[in-house]
From Swiss-Prot:
Protein family per UniProt: Belongs to the conotoxin M superfamily.
Comment block on domains: The cysteine framework is III (CC-C-C-CC). Classified in the M-1 branch, since 1 residue stands between the fourth and the fifth cysteine residues.
Disulfide linkage: C55-C67, C56-C65, C61-C68
Gene Ontology terms, MF aspect: ion channel inhibitor activity; toxin activity
Name recorded for this polypeptide: Conotoxin Lp3.1
Higher taxonomy: Eukaryota, Metazoa, Spiralia, Lophotrochozoa, Mollusca
UniProt tissue specificity: Expressed by the venom duct.
Chief subcellular location: secreted
Residue ranges listed under propeptide: 21-54
Pfam families in UniProt: Conotoxin
Length: 69
């Protein structure tokens, strides 16, 4: 009886869990498909600068901080 219970558990619980498609994988695939269709010039324009709180050196300023403008 124990062997039958183990087999039922494996085939009714564990096997379906391993065959389920994870929903978290889909946005990554969709994002990769969208980015794949972009031209290299368009891909470079997507990068965003992180907001900065401190001021940067004037010779290294890229316009992302408030003190540079």
């Amino acid at each position: 009886m124990l062997k039958m219970g183990v087999l039922l558990f494996i085939f009714l619980v564990l096997f379906p869990l391993t065959t389920l498609e994870l929903d978290t994988d889909r946005p990554v695939e969709r994002h990769a498909a969208i980015k794949q269709d972009l031209k290299p010039q368009e891909r470079r324009g997507i990068r965003l600068h992180a907001p900065r709180d401190e001021c940067c050196e004037p010779q290294w300023c890229d316009g992302a901080c408030d003190c540079c403008s």
